[in-house]
């Protein structure tokens, strides 16, 4: 009945009446996502009628009402077939300021029309294969990039920027050709990186270092939404970059990684928005060539070095807050390097473990990222080793028992999801420099058996990658417990593949020097 009344007014009424009836329809169906099939034909005709109104000279408020209803109706895939034509798509492109390259964005009164047109295009392109084909024919991706360039550094049009980015994300998600076009022809990587710089108000202090104001205000909701959409679009553009990239691209990837480091060190308007922002940053960092991730850590500034030199003992006993701050800062510094971003990633990983669900989607990206960073960058590995696998003092409880990060990761080594189990074990193995005896020390043989069997290391040894050598750091507690622990380690294999008998292992053990190959 609503569609029939609205259709009658749209066909015969004047602009004021059309605006009123469509506003009523929009208010009533704002949260409608499932539609009655009996009224399908009426909704198709209403869409056609709305497009006929949009080509006329009607007030801006009437255009907005038309577009709001069109956005609601475009949630129904079935009605889009007859209305998704090249002519109708061009109408929406014109209203979204995507039709002519020289259109300006000076008329603030037009902004609601632009935003609603972009929202309609997002729904229509996502739900209609015909619209997707027309998007390629009309070169929609190039038009969206052009609109983004007009929006650059214009904070008062964040809504336009946000839905432009969302439409770019949808297009690049659905078409691999558009990903390639965005990456190479349209220079999407630097363009989208600049959008992030603008959203975060980044001030560069060095080529790949930005100023971080830890006491500054959080991002606004609009800036956060823009940043999230830009991160998602960048993910699609760079999805294969970790496999193939030119040396000339390294600078741009390092700039992007530096922007993502800044992203990890700021917060959104709410805790949930901050987690969503950081989650998308983690996903994008996974696409960055690992050789370019060195910018996630940076040398301490002179001010930070001076602050680091001040010990806790030098602070007055009544300065509890200052002591807490100094202690916090000291845990984020390693070998003269600022490790704040890595510390944030580690905390993010632990929060995802504590959630206890959706490990494959929520946990594996950050675990994979930390694993690759640790494998490629020594300072990152050593810092994470200190945080995750500190010197072993608790030798009475099983490795999987407890609430430390190590305990949580060891429990994941026997998770039912094969992917989760493998990446958790791989992360710990890399932190142990791929040494079997070191891994067994921290995880126990039963927990590590799956990884060792897959790598053919049940008899001991080490992985294929090379790591630096350092001094022994076994604790006295571990050294005292180690003779007992040796009896639980694998007894070795004979040439025929059978396990060495216990008696033979005991006789061999009596002449083996007590050593430890765990070094950092």
Swiss-Prot record:
Outcome after substituting residue 166 to A: Reduced ability to fold GNAL
Name of a matching Pfam family: Ric8
GO biological-process terms attached to the record: G protein-coupled receptor signaling pathway; sensory perception of smell
In-chain residues carrying the UniProt-annotated modification Phosphoserine: 468
Reported effect, residue 75 to E: Strongly reduced ability to fold GNAL
GO molecular function: G-protein alpha-subunit binding; guanyl-nucleotide exchange factor activity; protein folding chaperone
Domain of life of the native organism: Eukaryota
PANTHER family documented for this protein: SYNEMBRYN, SYNEMBRYN-B
Function: Chaperone that specifically binds and folds nascent G(s) G-alpha proteins (GNAS and GNAL) prior to G protein heterotrimer formation, promoting their association with the plasma membrane. Also acts as a guanine nucleotide exchange factor (GEF) for G(s) proteins by stimulating exchange of bound GDP for free GTP. Acts as an important component for odorant signal transduction by mediating GNAL (G(olf)-alpha) folding, thereby promoting-dependent cAMP accumulation in olfactory sensory neurons.
Subunit and partners: Interacts with GDP-bound G(s) G-alpha proteins GNAL and GNAS. Does not interact with G-alpha proteins when they are in complex with subunits beta and gamma.
Family, per entry: Belongs to the synembryn family.
Protein name, per record: Chaperone Ric-8B
Organism: Mus musculus (Mouse)
Encoding gene, per UniProt annotation: Ric8b
């Amino acid at each position: 009945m609503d569609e029939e009344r609205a259709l009658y007014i749209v066909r015969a009424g004047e602009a004021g009446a059309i605006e009123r009836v469509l506003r009523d329809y929009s208010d009533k169906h704002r949260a409608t996502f499932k539609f009655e099939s009996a009224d399908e034909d009426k909704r198709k005709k209403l869409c056609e009628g709305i497009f006929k109104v949009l080509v006329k000279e009607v007030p801006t408020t009437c255009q907005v009402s038309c577009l709001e209803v069109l956005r609601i109706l475009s949630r129904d895939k079935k009605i889009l077939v007859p209305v998704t034509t090249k002519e109708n798509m061009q109408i929406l492109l014109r209203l979204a300021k995507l039709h002519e390259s020289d259109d300006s964005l000076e008329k603030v009164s037009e902004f609601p029309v632009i935003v609603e047109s972009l929202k309609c295009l997002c729904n229509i392109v996502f739900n209609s294969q015909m619209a997707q084909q027309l998007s390629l024919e009309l070169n929609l991706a190039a038009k969206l990039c052009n609109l983004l360039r007009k929006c650059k550094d214009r904070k008062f049009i964040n809504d336009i920027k946000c839905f432009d980015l969302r439409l770019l994300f949808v297009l690049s998600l659905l078409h691999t050709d558009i990903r390639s076009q965005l990456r190479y022809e349209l220079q999407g990587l630097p363009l989208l990186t600049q959008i992030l710089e603008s959203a975060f108000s980044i001030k560069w202090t060095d080529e790949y270092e930005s100023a971080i104001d830890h006491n500054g205000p959080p991002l606004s909701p609009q800036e956060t939404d823009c940043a999230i959409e830009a991160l998602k679009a960048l993910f699609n553009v760079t999805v294969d970059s970790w496999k193939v990239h030119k040396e000339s691209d390294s600078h741009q990837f390092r700039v992007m990684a530096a922007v993502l480091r800044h992203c990890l060190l700021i917060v959104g308007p709410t805790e949930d928005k901050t987690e969503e922002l950081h989650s998308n940053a983690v996903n994008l960092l996974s696409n960055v060539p690992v050789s370019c991730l060195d910018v996630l850590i940076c040398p301490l500034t002179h001010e930070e070095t001076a602050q680091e030199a001040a010990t806790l003992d030098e602070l007055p006993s009544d300065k509890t807050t200052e002591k807490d701050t100094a202690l916090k800062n000291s845990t984020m510094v390693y070998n003269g390097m600022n490790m704040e971003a890595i510390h944030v990633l580690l905390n993010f990983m632990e929060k995802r473990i504590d959630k206890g669900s959706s490990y494959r989607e929520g946990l594996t990206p950050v675990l994979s990222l930390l694993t690759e960073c640790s494998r490629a960058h020594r300072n990152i590995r050593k810092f994470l080793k200190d945080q995750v696998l500190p010197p072993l003092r608790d030798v009475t409880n099983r490795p999987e028992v407890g609430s430390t990060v190590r305990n949580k990761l060891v429990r994941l080594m026997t998770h039912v999801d094969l992917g989760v189990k493998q990446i958790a074990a791989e992360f710990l193995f890399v932190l142990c420099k791929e040494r079997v005896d070191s891994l067994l020390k921290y995880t126990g043989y039963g927990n590590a058996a799956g990884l060792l069997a897959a790598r053919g290391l049940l008899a001991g040894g080490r992985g294929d990658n090379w790591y630096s050598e350092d001094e022994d750091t076994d604790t006295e507690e571990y050294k005292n417990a180690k003779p007992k622990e040796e009896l639980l380690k694998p007894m070795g294999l004979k040439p025929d593949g059978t396990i060495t008998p216990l008696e033979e292992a005991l006789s061999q053990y009596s002449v083996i020097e007590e050593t430890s190959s765990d070094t950092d």
